[in-house]
Amino acid sequence: MSLHADALARLQHWQPSAGRQAELRQRFLAHLLARPDGLDRGCFPDHVTAGVLVLSPDLDQVLLNLHRKARRWFAFGGHCEPGDRSLSGVALREGLEESGVASLELDPVPVHLDEHAVDFCDPSGTVHHLDVRFTALAERGVAHGASEESLDVRWWPVDALPPGLEAEMHELISASRDRWRQSITSSSQPGGPSLSGGSTWAAADQPSR
């Protein structure tokens, strides 16, 4: 399955909450149906991107990066690359690359959508990132570090997040914590939630860029 086909299938089968999330799902689907190149970074003025919100196993801390160009705290994420085979794979690759963490337990189902304008992405002008967000767990205390795209990577308590964090980031964090809480079963790992059907991927599992 191509990356474009995977993105269409994931969004077609995803059940968003009513309101803005449902509207964004339709917006993203219309874009992909109209543009076979809709995931390419050269698709102007809109293209689909993917990201991941990383939480500690007890869900009380979130790992964020201080973006070098935007100078704001974000979840991890970015553009699709030629070697990517799925949207969840894009999110996982970006999460591993930008966090410096060796492995993440990824929920393969989208958790949140967001559309945002970016002024520094394309020399032709402002582009809109149609961002499909996933969520993952990483062990608290695991080694991490900033990539060339970030100024800092840091764990933040969910009740003491960076000042000025955007409303959509608060929505993403809340939605991700709710998703993991709902996934807890009697067969979950001791000490924290685990997805039924989720998977832990190491950096070595990812295609080269």
Where on the chain are the PLM-derived regions?
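NUDIX/MutT-family hydrolases
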Residues: R133, H144-A175
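Short, well-ordered beta-strand micro-motif
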Residues: V54, T135-L137, P157
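Conserved Nudix-box catalytic region and its N-terminal flanking loop in Nudix hydrolases
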Residues: D60-V101, D159
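Intrinsically disordered, low-complexity terminal tails and inter-domain linkers enriched
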Residues: Q182-S208
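Active-site segment of metal-dependent pyrophosphate-handling enzymes
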Residues: G100-V142
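N-terminal strand-loop-strand
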Residues: L39-A75
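Acidic, metal-coordinating catalytic segment for phosphate/diphosphate chemistry
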Residues: H13-G51
